[in-house]
A protein has these predicted regions:
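Bacterial N-terminal signal peptides that target proteins for export
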Residues: 1-12
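N-terminal signal peptide c-region/cleavage motif recognized by signal peptidases
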Residues: 17-19
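Predominantly extracellular/luminal regions of secreted and cell-surface proteins
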Residues: 22-36
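Acidic, Ser/Thr/Pro-rich low-complexity intrinsically disordered segments
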Residues: 25, 43-121, 128-130
């Protein structure tokens, strides 16, 4: 009986770990157009809220994506290429995130912003190298 209980506990732990460590699988991203033309977006995030955006970039032109929040909550930023592979992340503590990516090919990139630890107003910026 103890082995069954341990097995069930282990399965539940794995399911919870996957749910926490694999962000935004169910979030439908909003297309914001071309990354070079994007200025910034102010986002109201609830506790444990998340949003996803799509931006298009040109191969070889590095971009930097950042977040900054008004309150000291824990904001995470994840970037995925068009195949769904994670190409960058900043899951450090605090409201500020920063990632740099140099696209290998032209295409859309998905940005997932997740907030933990209380509601926050977050500014999302993207700068493309000239």
């Amino acid at each position: 009986m103890k082995s069954v209980t341990r097995f069930v506990t282990a399965v539940v732990a794995v399911i919870l770990a996957v749910a926490v460590l694999c962000p935004a699988q169910d979030v439908t991203p909003k297309n914001l157009g071309k990354g070079a033309a994007f200025n910034s977006k102010r986002i109201e995030l609830k506790d444990n809220g998340e949003v996803a955006y799509l931006l298009s970039f040109t191969a070889g032109k590095e971009f930097e994506a950042t977040t900054d929040g008004l309150k000291n909550t824990d904001v995470h930023l994840f970037v995925y290429d068009s195949s769904g592979a994670q190409v960058a992340k900043d899951d450090s503590s605090g409201p500020k995130c920063s990632v740099k990516v140099t696209p290998a090919k032209d295409g859309q990139y998905k940005f997932v912003i997740k907030n933990a630890g209380g509601a926050n107003t977050v500014t999302f910026n993207v700068k493309v190298a000239k």
